[in-house]
Design a protein with these regions (language model features):
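Glycine-rich phosphate-binding loop signature in dinucleotide/nucleotide-binding domains
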Residues: 40-45, 140-144, 503-510, 515
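Short internal beta-strands
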Residues: 77-84, 249-254, 387-391
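Conserved phosphate- and dinucleotide-binding cores of soluble alpha/beta proteins
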Residues: 2-3, 20-25, 38, 87-95, ...
Length: 626
């Protein structure tokens, strides 16, 4: 087990470093790799690195490339072994891990081809066992792996060691978990195209590396990260086996660390600062833990949970309970744009000016409706000037089957009057031909991507219109990082920032709503937020910015914890039903578990458990300040 260095890490069974963001963590990790390479070179030996794929290591690989290009770090004597490969994919397949590594790292540094090792996704089935044994032997032949880089999947897997993998497992062929395949669906233009099997290093293979580093970014990884670091070692979470390794560490950004005890319940691992925010977090946690409304908490319950110091400040639980309850109660408002001519002292949003110009930014179509569809409708109905701006077209989420359906409808319609509709016939026929030529896994031609974007654009427009937004106030920016890229191959550039900045400068809004602040920085949502942040900071100090409030919502991600919420907008049963009807406008791609409204209902149930008024559902927001 890796050593812990402070009381704050008392619950952690793997040494964990928390960084402000993913680039900072990646830079620290890359600097250590540099030292390893130089140290092994000084010994006359080659550094042996175990590498991972997916979006998590992308910032790390970009930093290694920078070290090579700008600081002269050579990789010409480094040996690499990758964790895994999809079974059935050729090395030149657009989603093969061999191609991923070439595009993300190998093609940009001076690593020798003969020193690169990945499992072969096309080895015949009757040769898989020998191929896996040979892979193990190749690792042993170079003296083992000095440093193994790992990510962690939503099921807690490292490599493709899905739940149930043994601690002693070796390199092998195995079936992929349904959650893993769903997560990869957008990469393969639909879950049906995701390979069902992969060849992966085993947990035992991974644990033989001399050093292990697991990296995780974004709030969606927080819960599984905490289970791996603080929970028991279990085959249900293969990453938990790192706990028994003598030199394993985790590198996290703040969002990925959110469920760790030292982040979530800091008073249990050391002296708390007891700021107003931390006090609120502690009292709400205690109420939910004791399954009591806030106003019913007693002195003894504070003492039993290590929170006696709070009582020394407030005297009795009675006074503390009232203060925290009032703060939580005041987050609730049916007027997200501010209630005109009302005392706004205790309201989350100011009354004036009224009406407000409101800008809703959605990194991908549907983010806005999922995260705040009910709030959008309230803002419109209460007289505000609401603009919705989609940063990307969302075409990468659309399957070929949807494009075929639309192309066939267009073709059959145009064929009714072929003389007048020749261009439409040519376009539809071209789409169908493009899909046939590229097959299920090829890169989509620009024409096909345009059609898919139009499909998604139509759904987004229908959804926004159903919530009352004017057609003239629905914008599609089609940011270049998305139109010219693909998942895990996005690069934010000046043109993206300029486009977002132009919208801000044109509208000069009083309110902005957006998401992506807790997302993986390589994701569309993370990059969308980064584009906004850069555009905002480029205009820092403009008079309109001083009067603009930025509210953060959650899109596809899990909802805020109650202590994080600064504005809670309640929805009636009818309002929730109307929101869900808008969500269902997105017929080409919608995750089934987002169609029932349970996320918003659960937030309302949590507020109810804390003792506030009972609502059908609640949409939650936090304020962002630059």
């Amino acid at each position: 087990m890796s050593a812990r260095t402070s009381p704050a890490e008392a619950f952690e069974k793997i040494a964990t470093l928390i960084f402000v963001d993913a680039p900072a963590a990646a830079a620290a990790r890359a600097a250590e790799v540099r030292e390893l390479i130089l140290a092994r070179r000084a010994e006359g030996k080659a550094a042996v690195l175990g590498l991972a794929t997916g979006s998590t290591p992308v910032p790390f690989y970009r930093e290694l490339i920078r070290l090579h290009r700008e600081e002269g770090l050579s990789f010409n004597d480094v040996i690499t072994f990758n964790l895994d490969e999809y079974y059935g994919l050729s090395r030149d397949h657009r989603e093969s891990y061999f191609r991923f590594m070439q595009e993300q790292l190998f093609a940009h540094i001076d690593l020798k081809p003969e020193n690169i090792h990945l499992p072969d996704g096309l080895v015949p089935l009757d040769g898989v066992f020998k191929h896996c044994a040979d892979y193990e032997a190749s690792i042993s032949a170079v003296g083992g792996i000095d440093l193994q880089i790992l990510g962690i999947g939503r099921t807690g897997h490292i490599g493709f060691n899905e739940p149930g993998s043994s601690r002693d497992s070796l390199t092998r062929l195995l079936p992929l978990d349904i959650v893993t395949r769903q997560d990869a669906a957008s990469d393969f233009f639909g879950e049906a195209n995701v390979p069902r099997f992969a060849i992966t290093m085993g947990v035992g293979t991974i644990l033989r590396a001399r050093k292990l580093v697991m990296m995780a970014w974004g709030g969606n990884k927080a819960e599984i990260v905490a289970r791996a670091i603080e929970g028991p070692e279990t085959e249900a979470v293969s990453a938990s086996f790192l706990q028994s390794h003598p030199d394993a560490r985790c590198f996290l950004d703040r969002a990925a660390s959110a469920a760790l005890t030292r982040t979530r319940l800091p008073w249990l691992v050391g002296r708390a600062e007891w700021t107003p925010a931390e006090t609120r977090r502690a009292v709400l946690w205690l109420a939910l833990t004791e399954k009591k409304p806030v106003l019913k908490l007693r002195d003894g319950e504070y003492n039993e949970h290590g929170m006696a110091e709070l009582l020394t400040r407030y005297g009795k639980a009675y006074h503390l309970n009232i203060e925290v309850f009032n703060r939580q109660q005041h987050t609730i408002t049916g007027w997200p744009g501010g209630k005109p001519n009302a005392d706004d002292t205790s309201r989350p949003e100011r009354a004036a000016p009224f009406p407000k110009t409101v800008l809703v930014l959605a990194p991908e179509p549907q983010d806005d409706v999922l995260g705040m569809g009910g709030t959008v409708e309230r803002l419109v109905n209460q007289g505000h000037d609401v603009h919705v701006c989609y940063l990307t077209g969302g075409d990468l989420r659309i399957t070929d089957a949807e494009a075929i359906r639309f192309a066939r409808v267009l073709l059959e319609t145009a064929e009714q009057e072929p003389a007048r509709w020749k261009e439409q016939i040519d376009f539809a026929s071209g789409i169908l031909n493009d899909i046939e030529i590229k097959g299920p896994f090829g890169d989509p031609p620009a024409r096909l991507r345009r059609l898919k974007a139009l499909i998604r654009r139509g759904e987004a427009r229908d959804a926004a219109l159903s919530l009352g937004v004017k057609a003239s106030q629905i914008r599609f920016l089609d940011l270049p990082f998305y139109t010219g890229g693909r998942y895990r191959q996005f690069h934010l550039g000046p043109a993206d920032i300029t486009a977002v900045g132009s919208v801000l400068a044109t509208l000069r809004p009083h309110q902005i709503y957006l998401t992506g602040h807790l997302a993986d920085p390589s994701s569309v949502q993370g990059l969308g937020f980064a584009a906004f942040k850069a555009a905002w900071e480029a205009r820092d100090g403009q008079p309109w910015q001083e009067h603009c409030r930025v509210w953060l919502y959650r899109g596809h991600q899990s909802e805020y914890e109650p202590h994080e919420i600064q504005m809670a907008v309640p929805l009636s049963p009818d309002q929730l039903a109307h929101k869900l009807a808008a969500v269902r406008k997105f017929q080409s791609h919608t995750l089934p578990d987002l169609l029932d409204g349970n996320r918003n209902r659960q937030t309302a149930r949590t507020y109810d458990a804390l003792g506030t008024a009972e609502y059908e559902a609640i949409e939650a927001f936090r304020r962002w300040q630059s």
